[in-house]
């Protein structure tokens, strides 16, 4: 099993967006911002341990940071990783309903 300290570092925050809201309602899928070095097994274990739900599958994607301009200088935002966590039938997490209020 993963150490408790690592579990807390894997998941950073739920990712709330229009697409994430649709996935949560339609496909029982929750989207999280996760650590760049986290793998699918760690993400699944972290969600199961911290939220006490059963995970069906995990898909991950690295979102590349945008190039932004700050006056005359060019800068770049950091890359980050998000994970689409699909829960088993009958399981639910309600981050989206709490954010809508």
Curated annotation (Swiss-Prot):
What quaternary arrangement does the UniProt entry report?
A: Part of the 50S ribosomal subunit. Contacts protein L29, and trigger factor when it is bound to the ribosome.
Question: What GO molecular function terms would the record report?
Answer: rRNA binding; structural constituent of ribosome
Q: Which family does it belong to?
A: Belongs to the universal ribosomal protein uL23 family.
- What protein am I looking at? Large ribosomal subunit protein uL23
Instruction: Name the Gene3D superfamilies for this protein.
Output: 3.30.70.330
**Which Pfam families did the record assign?**
Ribosomal_L23
The record's HAMAP family line, in alphabetical order, gives: Ribosomal_uL23_B (MF_01369_B)
Record's keyword annotation contains Amino-acid biosynthesis: no
Annotated function: One of the early assembly proteins it binds 23S rRNA. One of the proteins that surrounds the polypeptide exit tunnel on the outside of the ribosome. Forms the main docking site for trigger factor binding to the ribosome.
Which organism is the protein's source? Haemophilus ducreyi (strain 35000HP / ATCC 700724)
* Biological process per Gene Ontology, one example term: translation
Q: Where are the transmembrane segments?
A: none
